[in-house]
Regions:
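Short, Lys/Arg-enriched N-terminal segments with co-localized hydrophobic residues
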Residues: 3-27
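Sec-dependent bacterial lipoprotein signal peptides
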Residues: 19-43
């Protein structure tokens, strides 16, 4: 009887031991799963994936009611690099102001968009192009945060790279007027603050680089910061131009050898009021089977105008004249889009480009050239272009 009793107790302890072992294993499994989950959570917090990065970036931009960016933009063209100081202002909804100052010649232009329209203002000439355009929604823009967000969201194959300094998002770009540009890299610090944008061609060469010195996503801007009238000091420009004209008109001479005077006395003195071109600038890029067929210089009421005609498979005309300062602020309607050339922001239409550079106004027109060919010809009329003196 006693033996049977101890046998029962022994069996009971065996089952109890098995139960405790199994229960312990279950507890250990739960502990291990908890530890694994915590490790995964910590790992996820340490390094983002592409979706996390895009969400963080887009959330910051979309939550911003207005922002202000300051930095530099470099545009590479051949062996030359053109550098701009750039300030970007944005206010919801659809208010933009981009101030570009060429570091080489201090030439300033301003891209402005408000409910009245889209403008490219050149204060030094007291002029502005006014566009019938949906800019900036119709293309990528390395200096506008909304466009960068759209680029990465629209690229299902965008990638994320973790670096020592932060993150790099790589995505495709959409530059319909520049097929050379294919992809971009957007650089962030470890807190996903944007630092730099590089736009590449198919040969992995950086063609555009925007470096942000400061980014304020909580800028206190209002509609008054986007007024066209504030960009042009019309009264000051008018006074300066009037004073210049008066000074020219009052400059007189009486000798036979007087030169370069606006008014004078004497038989051999001639009135010299018109602006003259010191040189003719020819494009370095000319499409194949196309040649310069004529070069004509004509006198207009405001100065000399050079007309270069190119004939062949791709006919086109280039008009060059000294840029004229308007006494009153002038708005020139354009059906097209702003175009960033090497040294200037121009106006691109379906068959022409207009722009100002180094005190010369250019107009390029053709019914044969494609948009990319138009741009190639225009860009080749830069500092490296063939220059022939007219004197």
């Amino acid at each position: 009887m006693i033996t049977n009793y101890f046998s029962i107790i022994h069996v009971y302890f065996i089952f109890l031991k098995i139960y405790l072992i199994r229960k312990g294993e279950l507890v250990m499994k739960k502990i291990l799963l908890l530890i694994a989950f915590m490790l995964l959570t910590l790992t996820g917090c340490g390094e983002k994936n592409i979706d996390d990065a895009i969400n963080d970036f887009s959330k910051d931009v979309e939550n911003s009611k207005s922002y202000k960016l300051n930095g530099t933009m470099e545009i590479s063209s051949g062996e030359e690099i053109f550098t701009y100081n750039i300030d970007t202002y944005f206010l919801k909804d659809d208010y933009y102001k981009v101030i570009l100052v060429n570091q080489t010649n201090n030439h300033e232009q301003i891209i402005l968009k408000n409910p009245d329209g889209l403008y490219v203002v050149t204060p030094s000439l007291n002029k502005s192009f006014k566009f019938d355009s949906v800019w900036p929604e119709n293309s990528s823009q390395a200096y506008l945060l909304q466009n960068l967000v759209n680029d990465v969201k629209n690229d299902s194959e965008a990638t994320l790279e973790k670096t020592e300094d932060g993150y790099i998002i790589k995505s495709t770009v959409n530059y319909p007027n520049n097929e050379e540009l294919t992809y971009q890299k957007i650089y962030f610090d470890n807190d996903m603050n944007i630092k730099k944008v590089e736009v590449y061609n198919a040969e992995d060469i950086v063609k555009i680089k925007v470096t942000f010195k400061s980014v304020d996503l909580k800028a206190k801007l209002d509609e008054d910061d986007f007024l066209l009238d504030d960009l042009i000091d019309t009264e000051t420009n008018t006074e300066n131009n009037t004073q210049t004209n008066e000074n020219n008109a009052n400059t007189e001479c009486t000798g036979e050898n007087c030169e370069n005077q606006n008014t004078c006395e004497g038989e051999n003195c001639e009135e010299q009021t018109n602006a003259t071109l010191d040189s003719i600038i020819y494009p370095l890029y000319i499409p194949s089977n196309t040649h310069l067929s004529s070069s004509e210089t004509i006198d207009t009421e405001t100065g000399e105008r050079v007309i270069l005609t190119f004939s062949g498979d791709k006919n086109f005309v280039i008009v060059e004249e000294v840029a004229k300062v308007s006494n009153e602020f002038e708005v020139i309607p354009v059906f097209g889009d702003p175009l960033m050339l090497n040294e200037s922001v121009g106006a691109l239409s379906s068959n022409s480009i207009s722009w100002h550079s180094d005190n010369i106004s250019y107009y390029l027109v053709s019914s044969d050239l494609s948009t990319n060919e138009l741009i190639s010809v225009a860009k080749s009329l830069g500092n490296a272009s063939t220059v022939i003196s007219t004197k």
